[in-house]
Amino acid sequence: MKKIILAPAVVLLCAASAMAQDSEPKFTIKPTGRILMDGAVYLGGNDDIEGTSDKKFVDGVAIPDLRLGVKAGYGKWKAKVDVGFGYGKVGLKDTYIEYDINESNLIRGGYFVPQFGLNSETSSSMKPSYEEPTSNEFFYANPRLLALMHIYDKGQFFAGTTVFAEADAMKKNATEMGKQAWGVQTRLVWRPMHSDGDAFQIGCSFNYSSPTGGDHNAFNYSSNFPSRVSKVNLLTANIDHARGLFKMTPELLFMRGNMALEAQYYYMNVARKDGFRNYRAQGAYGMFRALLIGSRYRYSHADCGMATPDPRSLEVVLGYNYTNASDASAGIYGGITNDASCTFNYYINKYMIARLRYSYTNVRDRRIDDLTVKRHVNFIEARLQIIF
């Protein structure tokens, strides 16, 4: 009788043990990496720079971005560590821990790019226009920061809220810095349509930051011509006697079938003290995207933007950017730039993309040290990138 009773009991215990093991979260680990191989030819752009501190455009090739890293997951926990080796310089990239509270909420802490504007949904190597718009770079819209971020992502609404310390907090300790700048920002999006081949969303992002430059009483903003083979300064604004900064960027995304339109406007106001006038700057960009080969664009719900097109798709991207970094009332003339570009992207497979880009970029009203007041350049770039 005891054997008859014990036998089913043992079977039940074994089954319960097996079920417990099956429900136990599995630890996963995955290597990651990327390599970008660029080549560029510059047509003109070097006139009237003799005797100035302007750099020359030089035709050439480069590997501007090379990274190796690892992703790990365990149940609702995720982690990532990414190290960059671009131009032979070693630097820490994304390094964070993430916890999924539920299907609609997550918290991320560490060193990463927080949500701010439409461009925050793609990494630097996945910009459809080859490089990020100049306005996005100049307004320091998507830097990597030591931050804590909460994401709400459900149905028609997306909200990302972040508190952060300045980027130098990853390079220096607090005593060495003397003081740490801080800030808070949010990205708010409404997307009444958000399915593959049919999406429309509008949103706005807001940021407040304390000064990071000098002895934490200034802001230093700059951007290069949109090329990483030759790095040549385009805009520069050094704003001293700063008390704090407010910036915002409304965004628009429309996608229908194999065509899409995206745009952002940027506005920045730096409050100043000691009787100095506030500094104001603004900019905007727009991109028209179309699949020449491929069925339709897809929507990425988690990123709140467009997903990478399917393998063997060919895409054309027409882009225009305007940035005004000169403010006469503040006595700061960082420059005014226009950029028009045409980019072809061929998505070879899941891991490889080939890009070809033509761009015309000019700058005027630039009164920075002994740089030329105005300058322009035409250039053609090609890139092969591998990302896994």
Which ranges hold each PLM region?
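Sec-dependent N-terminal signal peptides
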Residues: 4-14
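Sec/Tat signal peptide C-region and signal peptidase I cleavage site
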Residues: 16-20
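Extracellular loop and loop/strand-boundary signature of outer-membrane beta-barrel proteins
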Residues: 51-56, 82-83, 132-136, 167-175, ...
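Outer-membrane beta-barrel pore domains
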Residues: 220-388
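Flexible, solvent-exposed coil segments and beta strand-coil junctions
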Residues: 47, 73-78, 125-131, 162-168, ...
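Outer membrane beta-barrel
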Residues: 24-43, 56-169, 176-212, 290-292, ...
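Outer-membrane pore/translocation modules
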Residues: 39-53, 120-122, 126-130, 201, ...
